[in-house]
Amino acid sequence: MNAKEANFDGLVGPTHNYAGLSFGNVASLSNEKSDANPKAAAKQGLRKMKQLADLGFAQGVLPPQERPSLRLLRELGFSGKDADVIAKAARQAPELLAAASSASAMWTANAATVSPSADTSDARVHFTPANLCSKLHRAIEHESTRRTLAAIFADEARFAVHDALPGTPALGDEGAANHTRFCAEYGAPGVEFFVYGRAEYRRGPEPTRFPARQTFEASRAVAHRHGLREEATIYAQQRPDVIDAGVFHNDVIAVGNRDTLFCHEHAFVDRQAVYDALAASLGALGAQLNVIEVPDRAVSVADAVGSYLFNSQLLAREDGTQMLVVPQECRENANVAAYLDALVAGNGPIRDVRVFDLRESMKNGGGPACLRLRVVLNDAERAAVKPNVWIGDALFASLDAWIDKHYRDRLSPVDLADPALLDESRTALDELTQILGLGSLYDFQR
Protein backbone atom coordinates (compact mmCIF):
# COMPACT_ATOMS: atom_id res chain seq x y z
CA MET A 1 0.00 0.00 0.00
CA ASN A 2 1.22 3.51 -0.80
CA ALA A 3 2.56 5.26 2.29
CA LYS A 4 4.70 8.27 3.14
CA GLU A 5 6.61 9.47 6.15
CA ALA A 6 5.10 12.53 7.80
CA ASN A 7 6.96 14.70 10.27
CA PHE A 8 5.05 16.29 13.14
CA ASP A 9 7.10 19.11 14.62
CA GLY A 10 6.51 20.55 18.05
CA LEU A 11 5.54 24.20 18.10
CA VAL A 12 7.73 25.98 20.64
CA GLY A 13 5.69 27.19 23.62
CA PRO A 14 5.46 30.72 25.06
CA THR A 15 7.53 29.80 28.14
CA HIS A 16 10.66 28.77 26.21
CA ASN A 17 13.59 29.55 28.50
CA TYR A 18 17.06 28.41 29.53
CA ALA A 19 16.86 26.99 33.04
CA GLY A 20 19.57 24.34 32.62
CA LEU A 21 17.29 21.50 33.68
CA SER A 22 18.81 18.64 31.69
CA PHE A 23 21.89 17.07 33.29
CA GLY A 24 23.75 15.18 30.58
CA ASN A 25 22.71 17.69 27.91
CA VAL A 26 25.80 19.84 27.37
CA ALA A 27 24.04 22.70 25.58
CA SER A 28 21.29 22.91 28.19
CA LEU A 29 23.75 23.21 31.04
CA SER A 30 26.10 25.63 29.28
CA ASN A 31 23.31 28.13 28.52
CA GLU A 32 21.67 28.03 31.94
CA LYS A 33 20.13 31.33 33.08
CA SER A 34 20.73 33.13 29.79
CA ASP A 35 17.92 35.08 28.17
CA ALA A 36 15.69 33.27 25.68
CA ASN A 37 13.56 34.61 22.85
CA PRO A 38 10.34 32.55 22.69
CA LYS A 39 9.07 34.44 19.65
CA ALA A 40 12.24 33.76 17.66
CA ALA A 41 12.29 30.13 18.81
CA ALA A 42 8.74 29.51 17.62
CA LYS A 43 9.32 31.26 14.31
CA GLN A 44 12.56 29.37 13.64
CA GLY A 45 10.76 26.06 14.11
CA LEU A 46 7.75 27.16 12.08
CA ARG A 47 9.96 28.28 9.18
CA LYS A 48 11.60 24.87 9.08
CA MET A 49 8.19 23.21 8.92
CA LYS A 50 7.04 25.48 6.10
CA GLN A 51 10.17 25.09 4.00
CA LEU A 52 10.02 21.30 4.23
CA ALA A 53 6.32 21.35 3.36
CA ASP A 54 7.14 23.54 0.35
CA LEU A 55 9.65 20.90 -0.76
CA GLY A 56 6.84 18.34 -0.86
CA PHE A 57 7.33 16.57 2.45
CA ALA A 58 4.29 15.76 4.59
CA GLN A 59 4.57 18.17 7.51
CA GLY A 60 2.31 18.44 10.53
CA VAL A 61 2.45 20.39 13.76
CA LEU A 62 1.90 19.41 17.39
CA PRO A 63 0.76 22.12 19.83
CA PRO A 64 2.71 23.16 22.93
CA GLN A 65 1.68 21.90 26.33
CA GLU A 66 0.22 24.16 28.99
CA ARG A 67 2.99 25.80 30.98
CA PRO A 68 3.57 26.58 33.72
CA SER A 69 1.97 23.36 34.92
CA LEU A 70 -0.19 24.39 37.84
CA ARG A 71 -1.15 20.75 38.25
CA LEU A 72 2.46 19.83 39.06
CA LEU A 73 2.94 22.76 41.43
CA ARG A 74 -0.26 21.94 43.32
CA GLU A 75 0.73 18.28 43.54
CA LEU A 76 4.03 19.45 45.08
CA GLY A 77 2.20 21.28 47.86
CA PHE A 78 1.79 24.85 46.63
CA SER A 79 -1.75 26.06 47.20
CA GLY A 80 -4.02 29.06 46.74
CA LYS A 81 -5.08 30.94 43.66
CA ASP A 82 -3.02 30.39 40.53
CA ALA A 83 -0.99 33.57 41.08
CA ASP A 84 -0.35 32.54 44.69
CA VAL A 85 0.88 29.11 43.61
CA ILE A 86 3.38 30.67 41.21
CA ALA A 87 4.55 33.24 43.76
CA LYS A 88 5.08 30.61 46.46
CA ALA A 89 6.98 28.31 44.11
CA ALA A 90 9.16 31.17 42.89
CA ARG A 91 10.01 32.13 46.45
CA GLN A 92 10.41 28.71 48.04
CA ALA A 93 11.58 26.44 45.20
CA PRO A 94 12.41 28.29 41.97
CA GLU A 95 13.87 25.10 40.51
CA LEU A 96 10.43 23.49 40.72
CA LEU A 97 8.81 26.49 39.06
CA ALA A 98 11.40 26.17 36.29
CA ALA A 99 10.55 22.49 35.86
CA ALA A 100 6.84 23.31 35.76
CA SER A 101 7.46 26.02 33.15
CA SER A 102 9.72 24.18 30.71
CA ALA A 103 8.76 24.24 27.03
CA SER A 104 10.62 20.96 26.47
CA ALA A 105 7.57 19.30 24.88
CA MET A 106 8.67 21.13 21.72
CA TRP A 107 11.12 18.26 21.15
CA THR A 108 8.58 15.80 19.84
CA ALA A 109 11.19 13.16 19.04
CA ASN A 110 10.71 12.40 22.74
CA ALA A 111 6.93 12.56 22.60
CA ALA A 112 6.37 8.93 21.66
CA THR A 113 7.58 5.86 19.81
CA VAL A 114 5.59 5.22 16.64
CA SER A 115 5.20 1.98 14.67
CA PRO A 116 3.42 2.06 11.30
CA SER A 117 0.59 -0.27 10.40
CA ALA A 118 2.80 -2.30 8.05
CA ASP A 119 4.80 -3.50 11.07
CA THR A 120 2.16 -4.12 13.74
CA SER A 121 0.15 -7.24 14.49
CA ASP A 122 -3.24 -5.52 14.22
CA ALA A 123 -2.35 -3.36 11.18
CA ARG A 124 -2.90 -0.11 13.09
CA VAL A 125 -0.43 2.72 13.67
CA HIS A 126 0.72 2.45 17.29
CA PHE A 127 1.87 5.31 19.51
CA THR A 128 3.40 4.90 22.97
CA PRO A 129 4.01 8.24 24.69
CA ALA A 130 7.41 8.30 26.37
CA ASN A 131 7.38 8.42 30.17
CA LEU A 132 10.57 10.54 30.20
CA CYS A 133 10.94 9.60 33.84
CA SER A 134 14.60 10.59 34.11
CA LYS A 135 13.78 14.32 34.31
CA LEU A 136 10.98 15.95 36.31
CA HIS A 137 10.31 18.66 33.75
CA ARG A 138 9.77 16.01 31.08
CA ALA A 139 8.08 13.33 33.19
CA ILE A 140 5.01 15.59 33.37
CA GLU A 141 4.54 15.56 29.59
CA HIS A 142 3.22 12.11 28.74
CA GLU A 143 -0.41 12.52 29.81
CA SER A 144 -0.81 15.67 27.71
CA THR A 145 1.07 13.98 24.88
CA ARG A 146 -1.38 11.08 24.93
CA ARG A 147 -4.31 13.47 24.92
CA THR A 148 -2.88 15.42 21.98
CA LEU A 149 -2.09 12.32 19.93
CA ALA A 150 -5.54 10.89 20.64
CA ALA A 151 -7.12 14.12 19.39
CA ILE A 152 -5.10 14.21 16.17
CA PHE A 153 -5.12 10.46 15.48
CA ALA A 154 -8.64 9.87 16.73
CA ASP A 155 -9.80 7.00 14.48
CA GLU A 156 -9.36 3.95 16.71
CA ALA A 157 -9.86 1.63 13.76
CA ARG A 158 -6.60 2.94 12.32
CA PHE A 159 -4.65 4.29 15.30
CA ALA A 160 -3.80 2.92 18.76
CA VAL A 161 -2.64 5.58 21.24
CA HIS A 162 -1.37 3.89 24.40
CA ASP A 163 -0.58 5.23 27.84
CA ALA A 164 3.08 5.68 28.72
CA LEU A 165 4.99 2.82 30.34
CA PRO A 166 5.12 2.94 34.16
CA GLY A 167 7.40 5.76 35.25
CA THR A 168 10.11 3.76 36.96
CA PRO A 169 13.87 3.83 36.23
CA ALA A 170 13.71 0.20 35.07
CA LEU A 171 11.41 1.31 32.24
CA GLY A 172 12.96 4.66 31.41
CA ASP A 173 11.67 5.53 27.94
CA GLU A 174 12.73 8.54 25.86
CA GLY A 175 10.64 7.82 22.78
CA ALA A 176 11.59 8.09 19.12
CA ALA A 177 14.92 9.78 19.91
CA ASN A 178 16.16 6.22 20.51
CA HIS A 179 14.23 4.52 17.72
CA THR A 180 14.26 4.41 13.95
CA ARG A 181 12.86 2.25 11.20
CA PHE A 182 14.40 0.79 8.07
CA CYS A 183 12.48 -0.39 5.02
CA ALA A 184 12.56 -0.70 1.25
CA GLU A 185 9.37 1.32 0.85
CA TYR A 186 7.41 3.09 3.59
CA GLY A 187 4.27 1.04 2.96
CA ALA A 188 6.12 -2.29 3.14
CA PRO A 189 7.03 -4.13 6.36
CA GLY A 190 10.20 -2.76 7.91
CA VAL A 191 12.82 -3.34 10.58
CA GLU A 192 12.40 -1.38 13.81
CA PHE A 193 15.61 -0.42 15.57
CA PHE A 194 15.68 0.36 19.29
CA VAL A 195 18.77 1.81 20.98
CA TYR A 196 19.18 1.76 24.75
CA GLY A 197 21.74 3.10 27.19
CA ARG A 198 21.58 0.44 29.89
CA ALA A 199 19.75 -2.70 30.96
CA GLU A 200 18.10 -2.92 34.37
CA TYR A 201 18.14 -6.69 34.79
CA ARG A 202 21.34 -7.83 33.16
CA ARG A 203 24.93 -6.78 33.58
CA GLY A 204 26.63 -4.67 30.98
CA PRO A 205 28.60 -1.49 30.45
CA GLU A 206 27.06 1.75 31.69
CA PRO A 207 28.10 5.40 31.60
CA THR A 208 29.72 6.84 34.72
CA ARG A 209 29.42 10.60 34.25
CA PHE A 210 25.94 11.13 32.84
CA PRO A 211 22.86 8.90 33.24
CA ALA A 212 21.63 6.48 30.59
CA ARG A 213 18.00 7.50 30.12
CA GLN A 214 16.71 4.62 27.96
CA THR A 215 16.60 1.04 29.20
CA PHE A 216 16.54 -2.14 27.18
CA GLU A 217 13.48 -3.22 29.14
CA ALA A 218 11.54 -0.13 28.05
CA SER A 219 12.46 -0.61 24.41
CA ARG A 220 11.41 -4.25 24.51
CA ALA A 221 8.13 -3.40 26.24
CA VAL A 222 7.24 -0.89 23.53
CA ALA A 223 8.03 -3.44 20.83
CA HIS A 224 5.83 -6.02 22.54
CA ARG A 225 3.02 -3.52 23.04
CA HIS A 226 3.08 -2.56 19.35
CA GLY A 227 2.96 -6.19 18.26
CA LEU A 228 6.20 -6.07 16.28
CA ARG A 229 7.68 -9.15 14.65
CA GLU A 230 10.65 -10.46 16.63
CA GLU A 231 12.66 -11.20 13.52
CA ALA A 232 12.24 -7.58 12.38
CA THR A 233 13.06 -5.91 15.70
CA ILE A 234 16.68 -5.12 16.52
CA TYR A 235 18.08 -3.83 19.82
CA ALA A 236 21.46 -2.15 20.20
CA GLN A 237 23.29 -0.50 23.06
CA GLN A 238 24.67 2.99 22.74
CA ARG A 239 28.30 3.28 23.77
CA PRO A 240 28.54 4.44 27.39
CA ASP A 241 31.53 6.68 26.70
CA VAL A 242 29.57 8.73 24.18
CA ILE A 243 26.73 9.16 26.68
CA ASP A 244 29.37 10.51 29.05
CA ALA A 245 30.48 12.86 26.26
CA GLY A 246 27.01 14.41 26.04
CA VAL A 247 25.15 12.04 23.70
CA PHE A 248 22.08 11.79 25.91
CA HIS A 249 19.89 10.31 23.16
CA ASN A 250 20.87 8.15 20.21
CA ASP A 251 19.66 10.82 17.80
CA VAL A 252 22.68 12.90 18.82
CA ILE A 253 25.02 10.27 17.32
CA ALA A 254 22.96 8.49 14.61
CA VAL A 255 20.00 8.94 12.28
CA GLY A 256 18.35 6.50 9.88
CA ASN A 257 15.67 6.45 7.22
CA ARG A 258 14.47 3.97 4.60
CA ASP A 259 17.54 1.83 3.84
CA THR A 260 20.19 4.25 5.15
CA LEU A 261 21.90 4.49 8.54
CA PHE A 262 24.03 7.62 9.04
CA CYS A 263 26.04 7.34 12.24
CA HIS A 264 29.29 8.03 14.02
CA GLU A 265 31.94 5.36 14.30
CA HIS A 266 31.48 5.33 18.09
CA ALA A 267 27.67 5.23 18.16
CA PHE A 268 27.10 1.61 19.20
CA VAL A 269 28.55 -1.12 21.38
CA ASP A 270 29.88 -3.85 19.02
CA ARG A 271 28.95 -1.80 16.00
CA GLN A 272 29.72 -4.43 13.36
CA ALA A 273 27.33 -6.87 15.01
CA VAL A 274 24.68 -4.14 14.98
CA TYR A 275 25.21 -3.45 11.28
CA ASP A 276 25.14 -7.17 10.49
CA ALA A 277 21.90 -7.72 12.40
CA LEU A 278 20.20 -4.79 10.69
CA ALA A 279 21.47 -5.89 7.27
CA ALA A 280 20.24 -9.44 7.77
CA SER A 281 16.77 -8.38 8.93
CA LEU A 282 16.40 -5.83 6.18
CA GLY A 283 17.79 -8.26 3.63
CA ALA A 284 15.07 -10.75 4.56
CA LEU A 285 12.58 -8.07 3.50
CA GLY A 286 14.27 -7.59 0.15
CA ALA A 287 16.27 -4.44 0.87
CA GLN A 288 19.95 -3.69 1.28
CA LEU A 289 21.22 -1.61 4.20
CA ASN A 290 23.46 1.35 3.42
CA VAL A 291 25.65 2.34 6.37
CA ILE A 292 27.34 5.73 6.21
CA GLU A 293 29.74 5.60 9.12
CA VAL A 294 31.55 8.84 9.96
CA PRO A 295 35.07 8.11 11.24
CA ASP A 296 36.24 9.77 14.43
CA ARG A 297 39.29 11.12 12.61
CA ALA A 298 36.97 13.16 10.35
CA VAL A 299 34.40 14.26 12.95
CA SER A 300 35.10 13.69 16.63
CA VAL A 301 32.36 12.95 19.14
CA ALA A 302 32.94 16.43 20.56
CA ASP A 303 32.39 17.94 17.10
CA ALA A 304 29.26 15.83 16.65
CA VAL A 305 27.84 16.99 19.99
CA GLY A 306 28.81 20.62 19.41
CA SER A 307 27.37 20.80 15.89
CA TYR A 308 24.53 18.27 16.22
CA LEU A 309 25.53 16.74 12.89
CA PHE A 310 23.57 13.57 13.63
CA ASN A 311 20.61 15.34 15.21
CA SER A 312 19.59 15.97 11.64
CA GLN A 313 16.60 14.91 9.60
CA LEU A 314 17.25 12.34 6.92
CA LEU A 315 14.46 12.71 4.38
CA ALA A 316 13.75 10.50 1.36
CA ARG A 317 12.95 12.28 -1.87
CA GLU A 318 10.79 11.04 -4.71
CA ASP A 319 13.83 10.21 -6.85
CA GLY A 320 15.14 7.78 -4.22
CA THR A 321 17.95 10.02 -2.97
CA GLN A 322 18.07 11.42 0.54
CA MET A 323 18.35 14.93 1.91
CA LEU A 324 19.96 15.86 5.21
CA VAL A 325 18.49 18.74 7.24
CA VAL A 326 21.11 20.18 9.60
CA PRO A 327 21.38 23.14 11.97
CA GLN A 328 23.58 26.07 10.96
CA GLU A 329 26.07 25.05 13.65
CA CYS A 330 27.20 22.32 11.22
CA ARG A 331 28.43 24.99 8.81
CA GLU A 332 30.18 26.83 11.64
CA ASN A 333 32.29 23.78 12.56
CA ALA A 334 35.13 23.41 10.05
CA ASN A 335 35.48 19.64 10.42
CA VAL A 336 31.76 19.01 10.08
CA ALA A 337 31.39 21.42 7.16
CA ALA A 338 34.25 19.73 5.31
CA TYR A 339 32.74 16.30 5.93
CA LEU A 340 29.32 17.40 4.64
CA ASP A 341 30.85 18.87 1.49
CA ALA A 342 32.62 15.58 0.79
CA LEU A 343 29.48 13.60 1.59
CA VAL A 344 27.34 15.43 -0.95
CA ALA A 345 30.09 15.31 -3.56
CA GLY A 346 30.25 11.54 -3.26
CA ASN A 347 28.04 8.99 -4.94
CA GLY A 348 26.14 7.91 -1.82
CA PRO A 349 22.43 8.14 -1.05
CA ILE A 350 22.69 11.59 0.62
CA ARG A 351 22.82 14.09 -2.24
CA ASP A 352 21.64 17.32 -0.61
CA VAL A 353 22.15 19.17 2.68
CA ARG A 354 19.76 21.90 3.82
CA VAL A 355 20.83 24.26 6.62
CA PHE A 356 18.40 25.85 9.09
CA ASP A 357 18.74 28.46 11.81
CA LEU A 358 17.39 26.79 14.94
CA ARG A 359 19.63 28.65 17.34
CA GLU A 360 17.06 29.08 20.11
CA SER A 361 16.32 25.35 20.25
CA MET A 362 19.97 24.41 19.80
CA LYS A 363 20.99 26.42 22.87
CA ASN A 364 18.81 24.04 24.88
CA GLY A 365 20.21 20.97 23.12
CA GLY A 366 17.59 20.37 20.44
CA GLY A 367 18.35 20.21 16.72
CA PRO A 368 16.17 19.41 13.68
CA ALA A 369 15.65 15.76 14.66
CA CYS A 370 14.62 16.65 18.21
CA LEU A 371 11.85 18.87 16.92
CA ARG A 372 10.03 16.22 14.90
CA LEU A 373 8.08 13.01 15.43
CA ARG A 374 8.05 10.71 12.40
CA VAL A 375 4.77 8.98 11.54
CA VAL A 376 4.49 6.73 8.48
CA LEU A 377 0.95 6.89 7.10
CA ASN A 378 -0.78 5.26 4.17
CA ASP A 379 -3.34 7.23 2.19
CA ALA A 380 -6.33 6.12 4.27
CA GLU A 381 -4.53 6.85 7.53
CA ARG A 382 -3.44 10.27 6.39
CA ALA A 383 -7.03 11.07 5.45
CA ALA A 384 -8.06 10.15 9.01
CA VAL A 385 -5.67 12.66 10.63
CA LYS A 386 -7.21 15.89 11.96
CA PRO A 387 -6.94 18.09 8.85
CA ASN A 388 -5.99 21.40 10.45
CA VAL A 389 -2.58 20.20 11.69
CA TRP A 390 -1.02 19.93 8.20
CA ILE A 391 1.30 22.81 7.36
CA GLY A 392 0.43 24.77 4.25
CA ASP A 393 0.29 28.42 3.25
CA ALA A 394 -2.86 29.21 5.24
CA LEU A 395 -1.86 27.46 8.46
CA PHE A 396 1.65 28.91 8.29
CA ALA A 397 0.23 32.43 7.99
CA SER A 398 -2.18 31.84 10.86
CA LEU A 399 0.51 30.43 13.15
CA ASP A 400 3.00 33.15 12.25
CA ALA A 401 0.47 35.84 13.14
CA TRP A 402 -0.50 33.94 16.30
CA ILE A 403 3.14 33.92 17.43
CA ASP A 404 3.47 37.65 16.77
CA LYS A 405 0.34 38.30 18.80
CA HIS A 406 1.10 36.19 21.86
CA TYR A 407 4.83 35.56 22.33
CA ARG A 408 7.42 37.58 24.20
CA ASP A 409 10.75 38.31 22.55
CA ARG A 410 12.70 37.99 25.80
CA LEU A 411 12.31 35.60 28.71
CA SER A 412 14.76 34.93 31.52
CA PRO A 413 14.38 32.39 34.33
CA VAL A 414 13.36 35.15 36.75
CA ASP A 415 10.46 36.06 34.44
CA LEU A 416 8.88 32.68 35.18
CA ALA A 417 7.63 34.21 38.45
CA ASP A 418 5.47 36.68 36.52
CA PRO A 419 1.83 35.56 36.94
CA ALA A 420 0.97 37.35 33.70
CA LEU A 421 2.97 34.72 31.82
CA LEU A 422 0.41 32.07 32.78
CA ASP A 423 -2.47 34.22 31.55
CA GLU A 424 -0.62 35.02 28.32
CA SER A 425 0.10 31.36 27.69
CA ARG A 426 -3.45 30.23 28.35
CA THR A 427 -4.88 32.91 26.09
CA ALA A 428 -2.49 31.85 23.34
CA LEU A 429 -3.21 28.14 23.70
CA ASP A 430 -6.97 28.68 23.81
CA GLU A 431 -6.75 30.45 20.46
CA LEU A 432 -4.39 27.81 19.08
CA THR A 433 -6.81 24.95 19.70
CA GLN A 434 -9.33 26.81 17.58
CA ILE A 435 -6.80 27.32 14.78
CA LEU A 436 -5.87 23.62 14.83
CA GLY A 437 -9.43 22.39 15.39
CA LEU A 438 -8.46 20.24 18.37
CA GLY A 439 -11.26 21.12 20.78
CA SER A 440 -10.76 21.47 24.54
CA LEU A 441 -7.29 19.99 24.78
CA TYR A 442 -5.96 21.67 27.92
CA ASP A 443 -6.90 21.34 31.58
CA PHE A 444 -7.85 25.02 31.82
CA GLN A 445 -10.36 24.54 28.98
CA ARG A 446 -12.18 21.70 30.72
UniProtKB/Swiss-Prot annotation:
<comment type="subunit">
    <text>Homodimer.</text>
</comment>
<feature type="binding site">
    <location>
        <position position="110"/>
    </location>
    <ligand>
        <name>substrate</name>
    </ligand>
</feature>
<feature type="binding site">
    <location>
        <begin position="137"/>
        <end position="138"/>
    </location>
    <ligand>
        <name>substrate</name>
    </ligand>
</feature>
<comment type="function">
    <text>Catalyzes the hydrolysis of N(2)-succinylarginine into N(2)-succinylornithine, ammonia and CO(2).</text>
</comment>
<dbReference type="Pfam" id="PF04996">
    <property type="entry name" value="AstB"/>
</dbReference>
<feature type="active site" description="Nucleophile">
    <location>
        <position position="370"/>
    </location>
</feature>
<keyword id="KW-0056">Arginine metabolism</keyword>
<feature type="binding site">
    <location>
        <begin position="19"/>
        <end position="28"/>
    </location>
    <ligand>
        <name>substrate</name>
    </ligand>
</feature>
<dbReference type="InterPro" id="IPR007079">
    <property type="entry name" value="SuccinylArg_d-Hdrlase_AstB"/>
</dbReference>
<feature type="active site">
    <location>
        <position position="174"/>
    </location>
</feature>
<dbReference type="GO" id="GO:0009015">
    <property type="term" value="F:N-succinylarginine dihydrolase activity"/>
</dbReference>
<feature type="binding site">
    <location>
        <position position="213"/>
    </location>
    <ligand>
        <name>substrate</name>
    </ligand>
</feature>
<dbReference type="GO" id="GO:0019545">
    <property type="term" value="P:arginine catabolic process to succinate"/>
</dbReference>
<dbReference type="InterPro" id="IPR037031">
    <property type="entry name" value="AstB_sf"/>
</dbReference>
<keyword id="KW-0378">Hydrolase</keyword>
<feature type="active site">
    <location>
        <position position="249"/>
    </location>
</feature>
<protein>
    <recommendedName>
        <fullName>N-succinylarginine dihydrolase</fullName>
        <ecNumber>3.5.3.23</ecNumber>
    </recommendedName>
</protein>
<feature type="binding site">
    <location>
        <position position="251"/>
    </location>
    <ligand>
        <name>substrate</name>
    </ligand>
</feature>
<comment type="similarity">
    <text>Belongs to the succinylarginine dihydrolase family.</text>
</comment>
<feature type="binding site">
    <location>
        <position position="364"/>
    </location>
    <ligand>
        <name>substrate</name>
    </ligand>
</feature>
<dbReference type="GO" id="GO:0019544">
    <property type="term" value="P:arginine catabolic process to glutamate"/>
</dbReference>
<comment type="pathway">
    <text>Amino-acid degradation; L-arginine degradation via AST pathway; L-glutamate and succinate from L-arginine: step 2/5.</text>
</comment>
